[in-house]
Amino acid sequence: GVRLVGSEMCIRDRYETKQTRSFIRVREIHFFEAHTAHADEADATRQIEQDLEIVDNVMRDLCLPVIKAKRPLWDTFPGAWYTIGIDAVMPNGRTLQVASCHHYRDQWAKAFDITYENLEAQQQHVHQTTYGMSERLLGAVVGMHGDENGLIMPPAVAPFQVVICPMIKKNSEVDTVAVAEEVAKTL
């Protein structure tokens, strides 16, 4: 079958009149998106399933509990057949949308006449999807794993797994730096 996959990193401006919050409610949104076109609805649906597997892997690595839910019609992306929202569950119980998947069927392809030639030499409209995340994902990581004492990154993404800080004391009989170096070698 036919499958076309493209990616886009872009900035969108939003007229945000409410109080902004870093990484959560911003006027300038950074999107990281994948756009796909498929020969049929079934292949586009498989793409959505693969996208949701990626979500599972990313959220597991970031130690973020999420809810993946099909949005009601009023909350579906304009022009989409359906939208699946991915919401991180924050420590206070509130949710923060960090990603979404949209299945358009062939609605946009018909509107913009996006076609391919099938094996019978007939023009067919493609079935499209999009999948994306924004910097809210970083906000969710900070909100989940940070507090007034700082940020502890999840092991899968932490630049350092362990930091050994020798506590040097005057007139100590123990060479704490040597002990720290030995511990580091053991780890």
Describe the predicted segments one by one.
Residues 150-187:
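Generic long, charged, amphipathic alpha-helical segments
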Residues 51-59, 137, 183, 187:
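Hydrophobic alpha-helical packing residues
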Residues 7, 69-71, 152-157:
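Short coil/turn segments at secondary-structure boundaries
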Residues 43-51, 133, 137, 175-179:
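Short amphipathic alpha-helical segments
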Residues 12, 17-21, 146, 152-153, ...:
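Conserved thiamine diphosphate
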Residues 75-154:
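A translation/RNA-centric and nucleic-acid-associated enzymatic feature enriched
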Residues 1-11:
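Single conserved hydrophobic/aromatic residue that forms the stacking wall/gate
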